Amino acid sequence: MKANSDKFKQSNKATRRVLAGVLCGASVLSLVLSLVMPPISQAIANDAQTVPTVKTVAEDSSTESTDVDNTNNGVTENQNSDETESGESNTIATEADQPSDDAGVGDAAQPVEDDTNGENAIALAAGNESDHKISSGEELSTRLLNPDLRDNNGAATFELAADIECDEEILLEGANTKITLDLNGFKIKHESSNQPLFSITGGATLTVKDGAQTAPTEPPFNQKIMNGNLASMECDDSNIPNKLTYYVTESVAKGTGTTETLKEYKVDIKGAIVACGDNADLKLVNLYKTGTFNLESGTITQQQNSGDQKNSVNSLVYAEEGSIVNMSGGYVCGATSMNHGAGIELGTMNNSGATLNLTGGVIAGNYAPIGGGVNAYGSKINMTGGTISGNGTFKDLPGYGAGICAQNSDVTVSDGYVTNNNCQFDYIKQQGMEDKHKGNGCHGGGGIAAFNGGSLTINGGYITGNYSAEAGGGIYAGAWGQALSSFKFSGGTIASNVAQNSEGGGIRIAAPTVGVFEVPKGSHAYITNNTTNTTNDWGGGGVFVQGYGDNVQAASLKIYNALITKNDAQGFGGGFAACPTGETAITNTYGIAIFGNTDKNGEHRS
């Protein structure tokens, strides 16, 4: 055993690579409201429904092309690339491509690590326990790659014993590689700017946790602005993040509406993996060819820059080719990308995307032109818990999906919070664009933007307190000529979101996407307290549905039951707005639950 170990160390040292309401332009639109929901008297029963509450718990890019880099990971075999393959389109329509619309949470708490992994526990391999404690970058690479330190199933658990620096790429490969790394309150500072810290491939699994992580605190707080509150980082003298502040707009059902309250959470960052290099191509944790990354606790983040120009990465976590990211706890925060998906990015290679399973944890304070928190292309996002909060697009670049942006991907939200994300680009505030037509609606998606094929399903959870300087404060469903294959809303809450200069405070449905709101018996769906502040002749405080143009059919919406109330438009259509020259059919079969909405230009309730 010792000879094998010595040979391994010599070989490893020699190679040194360490592979380790109703209005707008021209359209044909059909709104079918056939609410299976009982009359309003029964909607009042919603008050008795128990609704989960939160536990204590900005550039050189263009929206005309969202291709990202083709990065070879140095000495590895990895050919992964965010660049789309032949026949795939990762582009989105710009304002010049669209007609103007007036022309022809879940559990936000972080559990304290109890050193128990349940069925997924990976015990320390037999041998000297000191071999599993890591105090240097060299030890990190040699020990994680040493098969003699693993059990017969390829499993081993390691624990940091000090803050360390590492400038190498560690390649974990093969299904017989199952590594658990306990940060133990310490930090790994990755000093390389051109290669990942971890590459995970060929069925290998890396699990990261932090046994020293503590739960976030909730200090006294009385801020009244309920939306668009970006997360923030505090740093030590070396600009390494040591504190995170993020916000959750908590929503509770009450009678025939909801009540929102803004909560502030502060996190002491203990154990962390930190990208310290400044390179727009850097993928800190890189998965390809069926790698798996589990984040149970601890923090994945980026060294900040004290100047105006922020350090950048491609993404903190990148996955493709059948790889899986499971996030049940911890934090992915504080990254800036000039591409997209600063926090987590899911890409494709060889026609194979990746999957994000979000069951817990927090993705916060990440910035990119597209998909500040999470970006997906040809992939899947399953959100059944956790929090995506306070992520942003840039102020000086048009963008989509501050929280989540998904193209040709399947997104399902069943629980958790997408909250206080901010799509910041504002045409009106850009130099030389002062006369730009307000409300063009060609960019947006404060919480979620999904388009260019794929599906968006909301059957639970909370889309709350998100802000878009343009359209779709909560959800931007489809883009002009780039429809979703499916958009369904069957449960959950979309509340207190804002679209500032364009339509759709809660939801904007772009042509030619078809939306279906159908809530199963016994379930509840709320579109409440959303706002659009555009003063033009369209609005849609709760929902806006776009009309048709050249060679593009109108969007449409079918509502079978849902509650749309207490939404507001500074223009028209407090509850919903659509194009006025089309045909609108409203069927009042079981009682209509679109009421109590307001608009200013109409000077009446709607």
Predicted segment positions?
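Short, T/G/N/S-enriched strand-turn elements that build extracellular solenoid repeat scaffolds
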Residues: 140-151, 166-174, 181, 293, ...
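Glycine-centered small-residue motifs that form tight turns
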Residues: 280-285, 309-317, 323, 339-348, ...
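Polar/charged low-complexity regions in secreted precursors and cytosolic/nuclear IDRs
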Residues: 69-70, 114, 290, 297-298, ...
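Right-handed parallel beta-helix
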Residues: 183-186, 205-227, 246-247, 263-272, ...
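Gram-positive cell-envelope targeting signals
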Residues: 1-53, 160, 374, 404, ...
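Extracellular beta-strand-rich solenoid/capping regions of secreted or surface-exposed proteins
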Residues: 165-180, 189-211, 215-220, 227-245, ...
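Glycine-rich repeat segments that build the extracellular carbohydrate-interaction surface of secreted
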Residues: 132-134, 148-166, 178-184
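Low-complexity, acidic Ser/Thr/Pro-rich repeat tracts that form intrinsically disordered stalk/linker regions
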Residues: 1-13, 36-146
